[in-house]
């Protein structure tokens, strides 16, 4: 298959491309640094020429509420129109577990808007909702000396396993629906962040706070965990911290 990866220079895109190539697919990475801009449409037609499948793992460069909404609405609309013109047979999009449960978050509302464009479009699709990545655990806490982090349960996973799951979806028939994938463990967010701090030599102590916000939203124990029927990866947080070293090393 010919596969175009939108967001091909990012964390997931750079992990996904070699997996697809080893499986025998022809891969075209596409991102602004490679001359493809989904916001303006620049380079899209060329990047999608001959593509059977498009995998969209792109992300907004800004998390500001209006900017992130504009990014996902505009880029997704442009991408779907270009795919239809190019005869793409399967649109695979990476989204977020819990996006539809966190209406107070501008970022999550933008992801829901992206999903709505896909489900309302004419290109057959599969939406993959994944949980938060191990690689971003420390970023959740920010730079404070004693960061306050939600004590709600969540279910993080390795970016490598997100890429592996996406690679398994590519050759399948479009589901025209949503599938969820998450880590093998549910644990309090503050505990996961503290483990990441400890493993990386960060001496800060995380303060568990049930009122701490996540992307602008208050969490409960169902907000960020997978639903019934979800897929699960096998790498636990402790195993990832022991083997990955610094984020991005895997």
Predicted regions and their residues:
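N-terminal Rossmann NAD(P)H-binding glycine-rich loop of SDR-like oxidoreductase domains
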Residues: 1-23
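Rossmann-fold NAD(P)-dependent oxidoreductase module
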Residues: 15, 19, 82, 117, ...
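NAD(P)H-binding glycine-rich loop region in Rossmannoid oxidoreductase-like domains
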Residues: 22-86, 97-103
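Conserved beta-loop-beta element that borders a ligand/cofactor-binding pocket
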Residues: 87-90, 95-101, 113-136
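A conserved pocket-lining segment of Rossmann-fold NAD(P)-dependent short-chain dehydrogenase/reductase
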Residues: 125-126, 139-157, 161
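Glycine/proline-rich active-site loop of Rossmann-fold NAD(P)-dependent oxidoreductases
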Residues: 135-144, 169-179, 202-204
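Substrate-binding strand-loop-helix patch
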Residues: 153-160, 181-195
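Mobile cap/lid helix-loop segments that border enzyme active or cofactor-binding sites
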Residues: 193-250
């Amino acid at each position: 298959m010919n596969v175009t990866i939108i967001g091909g220079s990012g964390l997931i895109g750079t992990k996904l491309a070699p997996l697809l190539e080893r499986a025998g697919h022809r891969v075209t990475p596409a991102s602004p640094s490679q001359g493809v801009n989904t916001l303006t449409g620049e380079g899209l037609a060329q990047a999608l020429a001959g593509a059977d499948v498009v995998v969209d793992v792109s992300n907004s460069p800004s998390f500001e509420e209006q900017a992130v909404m504009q990014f996902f609405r505009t880029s997704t609309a442009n991408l779907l129109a270009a795919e239809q013109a190019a005869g793409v047979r399967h649109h695979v999009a990476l989204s977020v577990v819990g996006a539809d449960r966190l209406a107070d978050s501008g970022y999550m509302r933008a992801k829901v808007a992206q999903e709505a464009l896909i489900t309302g479009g004419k290109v057959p699709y599969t939406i993959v909702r994944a949980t938060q990545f191990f690689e971003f655990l420390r970023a959740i806490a920010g730079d404070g000396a004693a960061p306050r982090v939600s004590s709600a349960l969540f279910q993080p996973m390795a970016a490598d396993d997100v890429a592996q799951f996406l690679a398994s979806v590519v050759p399948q028939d479009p589901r025209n629906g949503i599938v969820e994938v998450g880590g093998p463990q549910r644990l309090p967010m503050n505990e996961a962040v503290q483990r990441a701090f400890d493993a990386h030599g960060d001496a800060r102590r995380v303060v568990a706070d049930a009122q701490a916000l996540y992307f602008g939203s208050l969490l409960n124990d169902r907000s960020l965990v997978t639903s019934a029927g979800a897929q699960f990866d096998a790498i636990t947080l402790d195993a990832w911290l022991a083997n990955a070293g610094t984020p991005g090393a895997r």
